[in-house]
From Swiss-Prot:
Residues 2-472 form the UvrD-like helicase ATP-binding domain. This is ATP-dependent helicase/nuclease subunit A. SUPFAM superfamilies: P-loop containing nucleoside triphosphate hydrolases (SSF52540), Restriction endonuclease-like (SSF52980). Keywords: ATP-binding, DNA damage, DNA repair, DNA-binding, Exonuclease, Helicase, Hydrolase, Isomerase, Nuclease, Nucleotide-binding. Coiled coil: none annotated.
Amino acid sequence: MPQFTKEQQQAIDDRGHDILVSASAGSGKTTVLVERVLKEIISGTQVSELLVVTFTKAAAEEMKTRIKTALTKELAKPGVNRKYLREQLNQVDTANISTIDAFCLEVIRRFYYSVNLNPSFKILTDETQAALIKERALREIEAESLTDENSGIRYFYDNFAGDRDANSPRDLLLDLYNFAMAKPEYRSWLKNLAKIYEVNNNIVKSKLWQNQIKSYLLNTFVSLQKKIEEYLNNPTIETKELAKVKEDFSLFTQNLDKFIDAIKNDEDYDQQRNLLRLCKFEVKYRKSAKWDEDIQEFYAETQKLKSEAKSQIFDIFTAFYATDEKEQTRIMQESQKIVSAISKAELALIDRFNELKRNENFLDYSDMEQLAYQILSADTSNSQMAREFYQNKFKEILIDEYQDINALQERIIQQVKNTDKNTLFMVGDVKQSIYGFRQAEPSLFLKKYHGFASEENKHEKRILLSDNFRSTEPVTKTVNQLFKSILSSDFGGIDYSKEGQLIFGAKYYPDALPKASEIIVHKKQKDIDNDNNGIDFSEVEMVLARIKQLKKEHFQVLDSTTGEVRALKYSDIAILTRSHGDNLEIMQEFAKRDIPLFITDAENYFQTFELTVIMNYLKIIDNPDQDIPLVTVLRSPLFNFSEKDLAKIRINSKNSGFYSAVASYVGIGDELSDRCKNFLNKLDELRKFATTHRISELIWSIYAQTNLLEIMTGLPNGEQRRINLEALYERASSYESAGFKGLYQFINFINRMRRSQKDLAQPLLSKEAGNAVRLMTIHGSKGLEFPVVFYLGMQHQYQLRDLKGNYVINPDSLGITLRQEHYRVDSLVKAIGNVTKKRQLLEEEARVLYVALTRAKQKLILVGDIANLDKKVQDWSIELDQSGQLSLADKLSVTNPLGFMGPALAFDKHIVINMNDISNALDQSQSVLYVEYKDSDNFEFKKDEDKVVGDSKNNNYTMDKLISTTKKLYQFDYPFKDASETTAYQAVSEIKKAFNDPIETELENSRLLSSTNRYLQPIDTKPNFLYQTKFTGAEIGTATHLILQYYDYTGDGSEKQLDYEIEELIKQKKLNPDIVPSLHKDQIQWFVHSSFAKSFWKNPENLQREVDFSSLISAKNLFKDFSDANAKILVHGTIDGYFVSNDGIILFDYKTDHVNKSYLDKSINLIKEKYTGQLRLYEQAINEFGEEKVIGKYLILLDAKQVVEVK
């Protein structure tokens, strides 16, 4: 039985009111949540009466697993109600323990009619495909509106015309869409965006000024006023040497006081503007070298304060007082018109986007939440029924990671909540709210955090879980030391020093373990902070050196599985970075040192070597007149042209494009010209192939023709490379399944993904990466823990691009820049919007830092390559106030993590040691070791065990490996000849006999091979009755399938209807009229009126017919004794039909095979055996790509007029 703290037990046992659990990192929140659910179930609340909401599928699955494990343990106890507990255990998998999206989807499936939705909708799971449809909608809106000079859209587009940055009007509309879709009433939200611009010729009296700008100005200048007063009250300033300094500051504060009073008293705008212009430092004075040292130091501090004050005055004036009131009013009025036009354009985009999705019967993720909210909130009888259904169903609603909820999700939960019938249990940590880019609103958590804290509040309760059971004491001390100075009530919304600190609870760590956190710094020679948005590679050198040391000294860690102390493994180490932009370079550095590295969230998919090769091949298949892609393909191991070869080709044709140069070289007549001819022939074949086949088939054909999969598998990290290539095929197939076509459009789609920095994550290996160091982004590490954590990127510049563009979007406003004839000017909404956005971004960056540092269990190592370190240490020493806090102004001026960390780390108060002395220093008592890495430090790297070498951008290194591997491949006696003697593309019609025929599968594989290099089935003998007509059995079967494909289940079902539908197919030239006399209409009539087809008539919208699919199937599942266990074959086919029932998918296939009536059972069994494999393929394809799963497979035997189930 776990021992819970008093607060944990309270969170488990408390009932009868809403509860917010604020659970700090490592405090066991998931354990508490599971234990609470278990207690609910034991006390009689069925698992089906609980709604448990998480924010990821993985978290939902983990939650289910933990609950099942807990119930299983409970079942083993004596005296329990085993029947009841078994029932609950069996219900866990189908219970409402899911993501918010999955719950919304259930609401829609159950009450789709409330919003007039076709129940056979398909989920558009690929966000990038949704983005393509959205872009299509946007282009249609533009085409319809931009030609009209009087249109509102044209008016607002003109305001952004000529922008050179990314902030175009199209970007604005697409960004605004994401904000709108997270709002419960997005239409009214969009329409109200223009209202904030109303000033009514009195800016100071406007709601914008009174509600937002006034408080910001007062907070800023009162803070500055207090800081100056502290200096004026310091005795040092009374010395005669500083008399002029005192006079200067005194005159400044007198004017500042008048300005502050004017703000407080709401004096008119122009008066405030004039008073602010008087806030200057005008007294002249100079520092003397003769002054005492303490006076010189104080003088330096006053000059820094003076510079800060001047900067604040300038920033405030340019943002809020740049023009007089008359001009400012005009700017606001013009901006209001533009924002009104933007809102109308956005609504038009949303409506068109929805229309295009509905035409294809698609729903995307934003639809799920919006439609679910509409169903639950509308003032209709259907919505009331939906609300009451869920309010009565659930006795408690439990929400995990509540800090990540947005306004729409919160409102959905509130619709299910009923004070008289159920309660809310919310668990989260606002310090870990790091998903602002997904419109998460931590303010929702904070509102409850403060509101639930009151002892007078009897209906709502707050519980704090502060004990950290993950980390050693030095790690918790380091985290607390940092965040006491960063997070406060006015920055982050929580007073960390009083309520947010971690309490060391992991007292199970042996005392003898080395625990101290480390800060390893290198003094960079030149400050290039402004240009450095990534990792400095001396940081990687420091990490490599420290890992080397840790391995060499057999650093001891506590194994969480065995409870025993053991030597450090590579897999115990995680390297955390803010972004993934440097992953490939870091992989290269680790590869050079033979230290295994595994990238767990490598969102650089299209930058990997193998994807670069195949994407360039696709580009030249689409258009060969592209020199860079063409040369890349020629130089690749697919064709192995050397640099010398390419030079000869270019010299022969100096002025043409490279494709023309290759074609021209064919006439030279040497060995290279033969290779050029071979390349051009293959390219021509693929270009022709591309015009008649799907993109996915083209990709697989390239793999088969070039052995690209085998080549890449032979390289280091080859299995990951192979999976990457297979995933491209899957993505192309998904792209086409969504209705998109064309190689050119597919390439553009991929390019757009890369440009928008939405590169795809590499599909991870199903197995873990073994003994390798993990490299991941901080966002990717959330929820994980590691014995040793390296944090890189202390100098990584925060991305504040949103503030520099021509618009800024916040939860309650859209601020724009107004374009004038010769200049641009920010509206007041944009000015205060910049302030709000910057604060939100910096608060989130502080939380990101918190998440990173709390991943460490035993050792936290901060790594930084810092320019001007000694100067920075001096500045940091004076930035904290007496309570150890950074001022709000200092926090809001931070530009990188070091700006938060530097002052709190107090470098000046600690002894700095060298890298070589770390081991000896680990016995010291301090919780943090300050380590300097010098360029003279030299660490030899030797090869170690379990190497995993990553990608490299070193062309020679990569190319040598590739060419070597390619030569081995072609000189090798290939053991899997059966794979090489078949194309990787197979039609179901060709493999269905080989799949399941008990006689044929016993033959040698070569019996099934033909000159076309496919596994071919023997041609079936035609049934005797078919010889009586001039049409073959296949032709009649095809015609029958066609009629059943288009049969209308909303008609009257009569013979006249059937005749009418046949006539329509003939008119549409889909059916040959001569075949009609040969059709067996009685078979068709039998089937459409059979009991099997009854559901088709009731819910025809749930019926899908003639569904094309392509799927990768393991060759060993298709062909017995296939030699390569890992080989896959592309299978393409068409499913006759399936019906989506409430329980799942019912799959069926029509068969017109002749049935011998004299031996009916035997004939049916033979047909069943013949086609079982085919239906299993169909089932596998549907289960692999669809949301619902197949629950039944049936053969429709038209000749026998029977429906036969296939197991």
